[in-house]
């Protein structure tokens, strides 16, 4: 479904070229639950931004469903982000003045979905994540775990090709973290493709495959329990 081929990324610091990612090769199959692990400064955030079409590599190719998406202009990348990728962030990225329902509707507004349909789809997404009794609540009235559920509902509402989650439990307590991870596991069982960025081995255990990035390079690719790594 998704293939990164020889992806490199560097930034200029004065006259010096500073490498961030070095010749990354990665394939993610449809329905796979992949965790990407690495320490701070390893390049995993840059890799996430490239996978999420938020940044472009310096070199290499990125294909999604056999389409070379890097050939498109920035406007085309924005369209891919909205239609093909469901984002879940550590800090939720909810608009505080909007209700849970209105926050979930936002991606469909960008897609020009009619009001009646988007309301119905947003309600169904919130019901799926267990928040049908919180549709009219605004983020300041929700717990951290509930905010993340709203964010997951928003990620699902456009029926994306895959979900890209950046440290989705990083701002949550233990109980809320377990509930959110259980929800991701349920979505995976339903066939959703999930790519999760994390530094926590306990979180990565929920995935069926884990890749490790260090100093801008993929150094390990494992399936199953990675507690020994």
From Swiss-Prot:
GO terms for molecular function: ATP binding; ATP hydrolysis activity; transmembrane transporter activity. CDD domains: ABC_MJ0796_LolCDE_FtsE. Keywords: ATP-binding, Nucleotide-binding, Translocase, Transport. It is an enzyme of class 7 (translocase). GO terms for cellular component: plasma membrane. SUPFAM superfamilies: P-loop containing nucleoside triphosphate hydrolases. Its EC number is 7.-.-.-. Residues 2-229 form the ABC transporter domain. InterPro entries: AAA+_ATPase, ABC_transporter-like_ATP-bd, ABC_transporter-like_CS, ABC_transpr_LolD-like, MacB-like_ATP-bd, P-loop_NTPase. ATP binds at residues 38-45. GO terms for biological process: transmembrane transport. It holds the Pfam family ABC_tran. PROSITE patterns: ABC_TRANSPORTER_1 (PS00211), ABC_TRANSPORTER_2 (PS50893). Belongs to the ABC transporter superfamily. PANTHER family: ABC TRANSPORTER DOMAIN-CONTAINING PROTEIN (PTHR24220:SF692), IMPORT ATP-BINDING PROTEIN (PTHR24220). This is Uncharacterized ABC transporter ATP-binding protein YvrO. It comes from Bacillus subtilis (strain 168). The gene is yvrO.
